[in-house]
């Protein structure tokens, strides 16, 4: 199934964080937090203004992004977990 987000919504695939600390300790699954970085896999056309114009999004498919801990709505597509969020939920693009 292929999804095309509407307006200023973005579909993000979480990027898993390291399971080992800098000191060499492994973090158990129960202690890990959900990652706050991901990759944009689909994006809408842009945000509609009050006068009907469409402002293009700053992020594009393939961008690595940082987002807030509680950002987005979890969705499952073809057995894979994604986050659907608005562009405003994106904190930064990792370059």
Curated annotation (Swiss-Prot):
A molecular function (GO) term: protein-folding chaperone binding
Main localisation: cytoplasm
UniProt KW Chaperone keyword: yes
Annotated SMART domains: Cpn10
Pfam families: Cpn10
InterPro entries per UniProt: Chaperonin_GroES, Chaperonin_GroES_sf, Chaprnonin_Cpn10_CS, GroES-like_sf
Family stated for the protein in its record: Belongs to the GroES chaperonin family.
Record's protein name: Co-chaperonin GroES
Organism: Pelobacter propionicus (strain DSM 2379 / NBRC 103807 / OttBd1)
């Amino acid at each position: 199934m292929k999804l095309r987000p509407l307006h200023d919504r973005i579909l993000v695939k979480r990027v898993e964080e390291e399971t080992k600390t800098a000191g060499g300790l492994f973090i158990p699954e129960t202690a890990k937090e959900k990652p706050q970085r991901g990759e944009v896999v689909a994006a809408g056309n842009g945000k509609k203004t009050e006068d009907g114009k469409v402002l293009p999004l700053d992020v594009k498919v393939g961008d690595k992004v940082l987002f807030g801990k509680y950002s987005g709505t979890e969705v499952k597509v073809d057995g894979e977990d994604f986050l659907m969020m608005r562009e405003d939920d994106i904190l930064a693009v990792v370059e």
